[in-house]
């Protein structure tokens, strides 16, 4: 008989190549018992980093509170190349011979200020008539122009609490960004390049923090193999996290 699982939050360092839902499925196969489980914010399959998993009714009821917390990312973009997904897994749509300098990238970052209007990518989880945009894009049920019009209608103001360049090695640049809920880093990477006179595709994306939860606290998914592993790493529900 499997031991009971503790309830609370499990901080996972998601590896590349698996969906956020795939992480939930992996944990369900370990649990083998009926318990409410969910995650607080999707990461793209190619992305790595912080995925907060809620276990139990008390924790899952707080998912919506975690999802609106600010998030921190480290991302690397490649200038001069733009794909339909805005990441390296997509099909190249256009290229540019112009590669901005490090100083031009830095100037572009400053130009954003503390907020800007962002158009979500075509490949995103935002829904249109009940279907996520990424599903509509993959099905080919709508033209690219129609999808772009839909994405444009979902434009929103996003907050940029902190934005800095960490490294530059042409044509690649790496940034750290602390942003509001709903900010698409793939779009931000391309928008940075556009303001510097080029275009860019995201090659590396890692979420390093969600609100007060830091990646240093997280556990690699592959190191969790038993319920005991889960119980040893569960963070009890602490309402102080949500009252600050």
Q: What is the predicted function of each stretch?
A:
Residues 1-244:
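Catalytic/RNA-binding core of pseudouridine synthases
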């Amino acid at each position: 008989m499997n031991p009971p699982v503790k309830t609370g939050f499990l901080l996972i360092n998601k590896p590349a190549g698996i969906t956020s839902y795939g992480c939930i499925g992996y944990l369900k196969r370990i649990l083998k018992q009926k318990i409410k489980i969910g995650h607080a914010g999707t990461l793209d399959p190619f992305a790595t980093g912080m995925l907060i998993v809620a276990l139990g009714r008390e924790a899952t009821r707080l998912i919506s509170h975690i999802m609106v917390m600010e998030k921190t990312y480290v991302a690397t973009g490649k200038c001069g190349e733009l794909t339909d997904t805005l990441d390296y897994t997509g099909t190249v749509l256009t290229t540019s011979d112009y590669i901005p300098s490090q100083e031009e990238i830095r100037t572009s970052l400053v130009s954003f200020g503390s907020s800007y209007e962002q158009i979500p990518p075509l490949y995103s989880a935002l829904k249109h008539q009940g279907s996520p945009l990424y599903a509509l894009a993959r099905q080919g049920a709508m033209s690219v122009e129609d999808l772009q019009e839909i994405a444009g209608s979902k434009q929103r103001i996003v907050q940029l609490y902190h934005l800095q360049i960490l490294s530059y090695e042409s044509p690649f640049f790496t940034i750290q960004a602390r942003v509001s809920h709903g900010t698409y880093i793939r779009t931000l990477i391309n928008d940075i390049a556009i303001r510097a006179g080029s275009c860019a595709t995201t090659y590396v994306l890692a979420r390093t923090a969600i609100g007060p939860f830091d990646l240093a606290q997280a556990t690699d998914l592959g190191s969790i193999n038993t319920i005991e592993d889960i119980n040893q790493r569960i963070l009890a529900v602490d309402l102080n996290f949500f009252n600050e």
